[in-house]
Regions:
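Beta-sheet-rich non-transmembrane sensory/scaffold domains
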Residues: 1-350
């Protein structure tokens, strides 16, 4: 199963996963990683500690000699099934979920960085584990060789402690001679928050902020230049975060949202314009336009409710067609309602 594909010069870079399968006897098996029916050498398979999902993630490069044939050049495999793969230039970042630690089930993500050089050779250069889970591909960005991530962190921790026990009256004498009676009690601690990370080219942490939004998870997120825009679930608000100082990401502005937002779109040619796709409280599709500049308030300038009630575009950004114009944009996507499948085309002009 292919996760991500990128063309770089005359090279094609593909990241794919090999997942476990169940045979006719109900036995779960995992095939050895292979390219064109040839198994990879042991030196080409990497292992990251605390991997959660069995399987393999393959990073392969091919030379495009012509339009009819691909020549394998480099390949490496990582033990574990990737949740997300992010490609930027020559770098490939594989994100895998890691297992919970003893008495600490905080969600964590293992990141492995692969570099594809000019000849197509693939090499693993760094690995790191951070707290949290990336919900979508847009929550990851490489900027100036550094990796930025916006994570939903669910922290859960349990531990056993000896505590003073309340004993009945007829046990008092026993307690007097044996010492204070105690009981082994379990304690649990659970919380959620949004964290933003900045990692250097060796995946070491430059800065992190776990104070972006407590008690929340990320619904959608987008990086543009040195600014992050994210929408959180429960409180329904959009937050603007500055990444200018990587060591200390700062919240610049936020706006309360009336409706659910599932998708954010930013325009590199016009950073002040943002539009979102989501659903109203009555279940109808909704398109909202915002204006924002770094360090100023985010303003909602228009909102359009559609008669349609569902769209694959809410979960898959590849189903959205956007064309920027001088003062606005065209937006097209597939929708569903009682009348069946439809393809509305919206035109917004500022």
């Amino acid at each position: 199963q292919n996760l991500c594909t990128r063309v770089s010069g005359e090279k094609l870079i593909i990241a794919s996963v090999m997942q476990p399968y169940t045979d006719a006897d109900g036995v779960i098996s995992i095939e050895d990683p292979q390219i064109n029916d040839k198994k990879l050498a042991v030196k080409d398979v990497y292992w990251q500690r605390d991997l959660y999902q069995p399987g393999y993630t393959l990073v392969c490069s091919y030379r495009m000699a012509d339009h009819t044939q691909l020549e394998p050049v480099g390949h490496k495999a990582l033990a574990g099934t990737a949740m997300k793969v992010y490609m930027s230039g020559k770098n490939v970042y594989v994100l895998c979920r890691t297992v919970a630690k003893r008495f600490d089930e905080t969600e964590r993500t293992g990141i492995t960085k692969f570099v594809v050089d000019s000849e197509g050779t693939v090499k693993a250069t760094a690995t790191h584990i951070v707290k949290g889970i990336v919900g979508e591909g847009f929550a990851v960005k490489e900027q100036g060789g550094h990796l930025w991530l916006c994570m939903s962190v669910h922290h859960y921790k349990s531990e056993w402690k000896w505590k003073k026990a309340e004993v009945p009256f007829n046990w008092k004498l026993l307690a007097h001679y044996t010492g204070q009676l105690k009981m082994l009690c379990g304690e649990e601690e659970s919380s959620r928050n949004v964290s933003v990370y900045a990692l250097d080219d060796s995946l070491q942490e430059i800065g992190t902020s776990s104070e972006i939004c407590k008690g929340e998870t990320v619904q959608c997120a987008r990086f543009l230049n040195k600014t992050l825009y994210l929408v959180v679930n429960d409180d329904r608000k959009m937050i603007q975060v500055s990444m200018a100082a990587e060591a200390d990401p700062q919240v610049l502005a936020q706006i309360k949202l009336a409706d659910e937002v599932h998708y954010l779109h930013l325009f590199p040619s016009d950073p002040s314009m943002i539009f979102s796709l989501g659903k109203t409280t009555t279940g109808e599709l909704d398109m909202t336009v915002f204006w924002a500049t770094e360090g100023s308030d985010i303003k909602q300038v228009a909102s359009y409710g559609l008669r349609q009630h569902d769209s694959s575009a809410l979960a898959d950004h590849t189903k959205i067609l956007v064309q920027k114009t001088e003062k606005g944009f065209y937006l097209g996507f597939a929708t569903y309602n009682a009348e069946g499948l439809q393809y509305p085309l919206l035109h917004y002009t500022a």
